[in-house]
């Protein structure tokens, strides 16, 4: 079998040739090549299982194995990332009825980085920063309201790998002392461009502190945004989201002065909230 982009060497790769071939076959199945020819129905898709999976193959199996490759999904990401701890990703789509966006990285210990839910009135657009353990492929999967699954891919080479998902420094409490920074600006088309920056270390549980002790996992798990008390965006995040998570999205039909409220919860059970208003 001709090697696929899944089979490139990464800083986590100590895999046998057999595992590499399995990953390559899984990637083909993932995009519906040599597998199913129709999008999976909602009954065949286990998004929760895909998010919880610890291997790329398990994530694919939970998704039903064969999202259809779609040219209606656009990925804006670097082909070469200098820092694997913070790789900027922007996803947009013109797929009708898009309701969920998943980001997966095949070379990461935790394949699914984030799972975004986009209610009616919210554009199929999201911007964030993720961690990559080494060279790999970003898979973007979008689910539509008729149960269809569609995907696009983007290969990324990492100059300095995020092995262990290193974060700078060992002190996290000062980082949590400040509130989230929220900016929501109304454009000429009546859409609010929302940008949220949350102060949080997003510890992966895979690195040691300066004393050589393993730093426990500690990260934001759930994120929700309301506009004028209406849910407009939500997400589930994993250890593969960069520290101080940045999430940007767009909401149509917004008005100047409407109140935007952001709430998030982390693995300690702590919940925080911040508010802002839509401006011009």
Regions found by a protein language model. Give the residues of each.
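C-terminal segment of N-terminal export signals and the immediately downstream linker at the start
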Residues: 35-68
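Short beta-strand edge segments in extracellular beta-sheet folds
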Residues: 155-161, 277-280
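Short amphipathic, basic-aromatic surface patches that mediate peripheral association
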Residues: 198-214
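N-terminal edge beta-strand
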Residues: 57-82, 172-187
């Amino acid at each position: 079998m001709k090697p696929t982009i899944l089979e490139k060497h990464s800083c986590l790769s100590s895999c046998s040739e057999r595992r590499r071939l399995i990953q390559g076959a899984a990637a083909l199945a993932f995009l519906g090549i040599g597998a199913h020819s129709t999008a999976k129905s909602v009954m065949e898709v286990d998004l929760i299982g895909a998010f919880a999976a610890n291997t790329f193959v398990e994530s694919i199996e939970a998704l039903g194995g064969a999202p259809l490759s779609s040219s209606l999904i656009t990925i804006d990401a670097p082909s070469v990332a200098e820092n694997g701890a913070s790789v900027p990703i922007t996803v947009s789509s013109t797929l009708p009825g898009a309701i969920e966006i998943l980001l997966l990285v095949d070379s990461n210990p935790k394949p699914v980085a984030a799972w975004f839910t986009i209610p009616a009135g919210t554009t199929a657009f999201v911007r964030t920063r993720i961690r990559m353990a080494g060279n790999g492929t970003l898979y973007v999967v979008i689910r539509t309201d008729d149960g269809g699954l569609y995907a696009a891919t983007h290969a990324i080479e990492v100059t300095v790998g995020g092995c262990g998902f290193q974060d700078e420094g060992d002190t996290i409490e000062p980082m949590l002392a400040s509130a989230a920074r929220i900016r929501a600006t109304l454009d000429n088309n009546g859409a609010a461009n929302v940008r949220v920056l949350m102060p949080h270390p997003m510890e992966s549980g895979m690195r040691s502190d300066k004393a050589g002790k393993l730093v426990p996992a500690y990260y934001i798990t759930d994120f929700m945004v309301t506009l004028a008390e209406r849910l407009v965006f939500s997400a589930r995040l994993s250890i593969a989201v960069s520290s101080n998570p940045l999430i940007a999205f767009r909401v149509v039909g917004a008005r100047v002065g409407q109140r935007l409220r952001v709430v998030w919860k982390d693995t300690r059970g702590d919940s925080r909230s911040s508010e802002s208003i839509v401006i011009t």
